[in-house]
Amino acid sequence: PDEYEKTVPQVFPTTAPGNFTWLPDIGHYVMTTFYPYQWDLNYANPVVFNEMVNNMLYLVNQGIDIVRIDAVPYIWKQLGTTCRNLPQVHTIVRMMRMITEIVCPGVLLLGEVVMEPEKVVPYFGTLEKPECHMLYNVTTMASTWHTVATKEVALLKQQMDVVNSLPKEYVFLNYLRCHDDIGWGLDYDFLKTSGIQEIPHKKYLNEYFRGMAAGSDARGELYNDDPVLQDARLCGTTASLCGLEASLQAKDPARIERAIQKILMLNAYL
């Protein structure tokens, strides 16, 4: 574990620090990238892959149409690396795609890749060797909320131009919010051309969506605030981030209507 910890970043440094959990009952460490109750699987063992495919096919036989592959970039481990986005991950996903196309061609694989824009698209594979059928449009989601907070559309337009330039076979699942937090994985190279720096901008976005900035009725909450890295994620429903929660508490009809219109606008845009 100590050797892995030298190169593997922590996902939840404040709520679940480290990448391993000691199990005294069996006298072993288990790799737990996310939370102690979420064990990482060793896909280097072919038995693990076979069992996971069996589980997938069992669900498909129950009538499941879309299978989500959770935290795709993390599923292969290699000492001396970040254990993120390794080439073997794409091999595994490609094998799963081949199996579904043969056994259950009507089923879609939905990949969860919550990372920077340039690291998301490779999980579609290529037109010749496809991997995931669909990916969450994480970057557009975060860019949309950036636009809500800043009233600036340049980043969102740039992001949509990137999406629209991809092959039509690449399908994104567009969404405003989900059960996960917002990690502000924006295109900071693009933002730097407008003089916007990553750390101060993340701080502003988190302040805006907690209702701490001028003109904001949002009521989001920080998640996994890391004072060392000066980074934090944000949690909140669409209604809360658009100001409906605060407006209802204030019993202000005008603010309630404004919040509802913002929610309708965002859903219409999607």
Outline where the language-model segments fall.
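Active-site and adjacent substrate-binding regions of carbohydrate-active enzymes
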Residues: 1-270
